[in-house]
Amino acid sequence: MPANMRRVFDFFSNAQNLELITPKELNFNILSPFPIEMKEGTLIDYRIRLFGISFNWKTLISAWEPERRFVDEQLKGPYAKWIHTHSFETKEDGIMIKDEVCYRLPFFPFGELMFPVIRLQLNRIFDYRTSRIKEIFQDLN
């Protein structure tokens, strides 16, 4: 992405920006009071709708390395396990943003039957995020 590290990391450091990069049909809504200071140990509560069902989700920022990476872990929510690592790396033509998600579905082994459907949904959500991030940073440049 053609932008500088400070601008990109500042964008991702503001929890309110999650609403800008989340598909509307997920009805993403942060419940924690603003402002939210992002740092290791920060807890964020929000509500999200998946497959027409609303879930409360509690996230812990378990790692915080400004302008390098941060990790959010689901403490409460629809997954048995959810660890999302956001990494940022300076490249010649801008910043490379990398998302890595490690997750496990609930109700093992029955939850695994939903894996193909969940995988498609996650791919669609992250494709949407990618396109929105590109649009937002094009507008800022």
Where are the model-predicted features located?
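Hydrophobic pocket/interface hotspot
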Residues: 8-12, 18, 44-46, 61, ...
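Glycine-rich portal/gate segments that line the openings of hydrophobic small-molecule binding cavities
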Residues: 29-76, 128-141
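A short, structured loop/turn motif at beta-sheet edges
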Residues: 5-6, 37-38, 63-69, 87-96
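Beta-strand elements of well-folded, non-transmembrane domains
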Residues: 1, 50-52, 63, 78, ...
